[in-house]
Design a protein with these regions (language model features):
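Hydrophobic beta-strand segment of the Class I
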Residues: 95, 134, 139-143
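Residues marking the start of alpha-helices
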Residues: 128-130, 147, 205
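An acidic- and aromatic-residue-enriched active-site/binding cleft used to recognize and process polar
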Residues: 118, 144, 176-178
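A short SAM/SAH-binding and catalytic strip from SAM-dependent methyltransferases
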Residues: 140-152
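Conserved N-terminal segment of class I S-adenosyl-L-methionine
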Residues: 2-133
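S-adenosyl-L-methionine-dependent methyltransferase catalytic module, highlighting the catalytic core
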Residues: 3, 15-18, 24-37, 41, ...
Length: 220
């Protein structure tokens, strides 16, 4: 199973993977249903989760029903239990919308929900994160998860996120991070997918963030 999923992840770009998931998801839910693992996003149980990972495959991490990973489920639980995110009416901007959240956010009547990405087939606005087509101070909340590590000019991208967020707004800007690394490592001369995967962890990543990521967010 791990070899199959690793091959699929390595062979198809993300927009195609999203389209393929529409076909595979109902079958996976049916054949893997059980009660060993519970997905807190939809409450469904499975005898096991699926493996996932572009390099080293992790066992039992991808939920068959929501296609959520650990970070998605943790974020869901945090937003539900520690914030008023789901309670207050808001205009929400969601970059590269995760399938785990997309349908659920879209159904919330007191959300004005806007999705954006350059390539995602489920994004409503095709836009460059470094040059967003939105007015300043437009959004109450912004979700931008595991996007910035793909962007060459992440400083400009973060500045754009701040520009379109309302004063006092909430932003969740998750990135993959090496907590043992003090300084972010990036080298824009590295363009070979295999070399990027080796150095940055994934073929389409352009850096590995260190603990200085938080200072970068503060300085932009």
């Amino acid at each position: 199973m791990k070899k199959i999923f690793k091959f699929i992840l390595a062979s198809f770009p993300r927009p195609i993977l999203i389209k393929l998931s529409f076909i595979a998801q109902p079958l996976l839910v049916y054949f893997l249903k059980g009660n060993t693992y519970i997905d807190p996003i939809d409450g469904k149980g499975f005898r096991r989760f699926l493996p996932y990972g572009y390099g080293r495959q992790r066992e039992n991490v991808l939920s068959p029903s929501t296609l959520s990973l650990e970070r998605h489920r943790l974020l869901w639980l945090y937003l539900k239990s520690q914030t008023d995110f789901f309670i207050k009416p808001k205009k929400l901007l969601h970059f590269a919308p995760e399938q785990a959240f997309y349908k659920r956010f879209k159904k919330i009547e007191h959300f004005e929900y806007v999705t954006t990405d350059l390539n995602s087939p489920i994004a409503t606005v095709k836009a460059d994160i470094c040059n967003l087509p939105f007015e300043s101070n437009s959004f109450d909340s912004i979700l931008c998860n595991h996007v910035l590590e793909h962007i060459l000019d992440d400083t400009k991208a973060i500045q754009e996120l701040y520009r379109v967020m309302k004063p006092g707004g909430m932003g969740v800007f998750q990135i993959p991070q090496d907590l043992k690394r003090d300084i972010t490592f990036e080298d824009h001369t590295i363009t070979d997918p295999k070399e990027r995967a080796k150095l940055f962890g994934q073929y389409d990543h352009v850096r590995v963030y260190g603990t200085d990521y938080f200072k970068k967010l503060e300085s932009c």
